[in-house]
Amino acid sequence: MKKLSFQQIILILQNYWQDYGCAILQPYDAHVGAGTFHPATVLRCLGTKPWFVAYVQPSRRPCDSRYGMHPNRMQHYYQFQVILKPSPDNIQDLYLKSLECLNLDLKTHDIRFVEDDWESPTLGASGLGWEVWCDGMEVSQFTYMQQVGGIECYPVACEITYGLERLALYIQGIDEVKELDWNGQIGEKALKYGEVDFEAERQFSKYNLEFADSEMLLRHFKDSGEQCERLVNVNLPMPAYDECLKASHYFNQLNALGVISVTERASYILRVRYLAKICCIKWLELSSE
């Protein structure tokens, strides 16, 4: 059986969850640290309206910059996110069937659900959940989203996050992300993951760790926070949330540079959490009118 390419894995997951009834959304056009930060998760997990969506989200974590030299850790990577609200009772079975659709043999791989309650300090979000391990490496995360922006979620939504690169390593049976088959072609049309993303990985690692201007980032963090508050005050929670995302990314960049002390780090996290909270409160207030 021919092994699935990286882009085929994405297409199969999209088709699988579309057949279940999910709307297939597009990635959010902002720098986010995970698929959870997409407003389709943060804002739409709030309120009582049912919400069934799935999407790919490119994600950035400056602290994971490794100049493209690490086999499976990068500052830029892809997640596949599924939100099911209200959460179905058979969610684990649905997930395992999605792995089978990806030709992952559940009999030869050790798939384990490891209890791991999830929390995002900057989003004020938390929930009960599990990490999903394949042969000892985390490839997915399940979370019953109980709180976002410090607000209780009712009904509780289930979030599934697939780590696409790590999952692809097992499906293709290789050890390094840069060697992943991206498009399933041969000859001059063939592309590996490294040919698509790893020059950017090298350059952004240098930027994140060596050349980012910390004074400029500090100014941007302050400005984004103030703009977020102004927009919330005029009933514009969605553009306000964009500013919250910017502040979160600036904080992550400052953290990667190592210019924030342990004490300062806590205050930055509290600031971003406050911004997320006021966006969520205003979103809920307007959507319930």
From Swiss-Prot:
Entry GO terms, CC: cytosol
Keyword Chloroplast on entry: no
InterPro entries recorded: aa-tRNA-synth_II/BPL/LPL (IPR045864), Gly-tRNA-synth_heterodimer (IPR006194), Gly-tRNA_ligase_asu (IPR002310)
Localization per Swiss-Prot or TrEMBL: Cytoplasm
Reactions that this protein is recorded to catalyse: tRNA(Gly) + glycine + ATP = glycyl-tRNA(Gly) + AMP + diphosphate
GO MF term set: ATP binding; glycine-tRNA ligase activity
Catalytic EC class: ligase
Keyword annotations from UniProtKB, A to Z: Aminoacyl-tRNA synthetase, ATP-binding, Cytoplasm, Ligase, Nucleotide-binding, Protein biosynthesis
EC number: 6.1.1.14
Example of a GO biological process term: glycyl-tRNA aminoacylation
Main location: cytoplasm
SUPFAM superfamilies: Class II aaRS and biotin synthetases
Pfam families reported in the protein's UniProt record: tRNA-synt_2e (PF02091)
Similarity-based family: Belongs to the class-II aminoacyl-tRNA synthetase family.
Assembly behavior: Tetramer of two alpha and two beta subunits.
Protein name according to UniProt: Glycine--tRNA ligase alpha subunit
Originating species: Rickettsia typhi (strain ATCC VR-144 / Wilmington)
Lineage: Bacteria, Pseudomonadati, Pseudomonadota, Alphaproteobacteria, Rickettsiales
